[in-house]
């Protein structure tokens, strides 16, 4: 790649805009969901984003994700980041799916009609999609197996590994 650090950063910011409907920051503990100016009520799609991000907030409270991230940052070693984020996203997707799965036909149609058509303004290199594939496609497959074999408690146990056993016991992306 022949991009400067600033160009890579700009691409990363654009990727975040293209790919994310909301976010929860592990460090500042702020949940962000973009809404329209003067919007008074969240639609069902936006509510589903809040459900997903609230799971991340709970993960932060229970699994010490801020300390986990700060320790990796201090060590300048993010070996365990992709594996744990895959499990975190899988758990949030699972809970969000349970919530949206409770919709009746009317709410499901309403929800589907409210999903925004998000497009990127730039062409992104294919390697930008590798972590997203792990977090949002491979992680949920693993989480379904964990939940099938040990319910949500088993997935929580996997996420508690940092709190209970330390950084170097966490799964890497290769293990996921």
Language model segments and positions:
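Short pre-active-site segment immediately N-terminal to the catalytic Zn-binding motif
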Residues: 31-51, 80-84
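Solvent-exposed, polar/charged alpha-helical surfaces in well-ordered, non-transmembrane soluble domains
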Residues: 48, 90-94, 140-145
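Post-HExxH zinc-binding segment in Zn-dependent metallohydrolases
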Residues: 62-117
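Pan-zinc metallopeptidase signature
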Residues: 119-176
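Catalytic glutamate of the conserved HExxH
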Residues: 49, 53-61, 90
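Active-site-adjacent bridging/hinge elements
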Residues: 21-32, 58-70, 112-122
